[in-house]
């Protein structure tokens, strides 16, 4: 039974890795090719491209940690390796979440309908708002990395070199929970920002629908459609991020779980659902990416049909 579960989780993990690499790679390639062709790189395309690249790095960071911990767990004993893995995972996770948050901020400022002077000022300076958000996030990243590295140095010094250590620092409670609590604390900030944006978008849509009812217009005007589309994107991000957040919290119980291989596969599968699933949503929600995806599907189908006709 355990072997069957491990095989199922491993297959799920492989599928998620493939989807994550192909989906995020597709987003980056399409936007870069469009930039090369048009010599124009819009703000939303810049955010999407940077997000896709960070997600690719995040997927590979999780895969690297899983492979090293299962095949060469002794490498994770050294302080240097601990710091490298923690720093790489923290940085890729940070940009993956904060760039998605910046995308939500962009949609909110472009679509929401408020007459407040502060909101209107931010709307006219959306690029500045996104840039400042990323700048502030870099300061938070610096603090996060400093805290994690300091705690790792202090914790490792207190233990012998022969301590038992495996995936995601799960055999030593003090060290294993350092990245858990610090990353959970710092990644909760963009989650709160996105949740606030979601609530404001709902309020903006409610006000807009109320205004349209007074004007006796249909509910599906362009502004309503844009609101609903933005809400779908934000809701999907919140849902996938919540799953990822719960996966981080689950790591706190890893020390009490005896079947650590199964648990690690479960954690990796849940964690990879965030960057892999969100890339598919971004492709389907963006008209340019969706059109490019449908073009590739049509080309593959035509090539397959042509190969069948040419075969004897």
Swiss-Prot record:
Main location: membrane
Family as reported in the entry's similarity comment: Belongs to the G-protein coupled receptor T2R family.
Highest taxon, organism lineage: Eukaryota
Record-level GO cellular component terms: membrane
Gene3D superfamilies (alphabetical): Rhodopsin 7-helix transmembrane proteins
Function recorded in the entry: Putative taste receptor which may play a role in the perception of bitterness.
Keywords noted in UniProt: G-protein coupled receptor, Glycoprotein, Membrane, Receptor, Sensory transduction, Taste, Transducer, Transmembrane, Transmembrane helix
GO biological process, one term: detection of chemical stimulus involved in sensory perception of bitter taste
Transmembrane regions listed in the UniProt entry: 10-30, 47-67, 88-108, 134-154, 186-206, 230-250, 265-285
Gene: Tas2r140
Any Pfam family: TAS2R
General remark: Several bitter taste receptors are expressed in a single taste receptor cell.
Protein name stated in the entry: Taste receptor type 2 member 140
Localization per record: Membrane
Membrane topology annotation: Multi-pass membrane protein
GO molecular function terms listed in the Swiss-Prot or TrEMBL record: bitter taste receptor activity; G protein-coupled receptor activity
Species this chain originates from: Rattus norvegicus (Rat)
Extracellular side stretches: 1-9, 68-87, 155-185, 251-264
Membrane-side (Cytoplasmic) residue stretches: 31-46, 109-133, 207-229, 286-312
Sites carrying sugar chains: 162
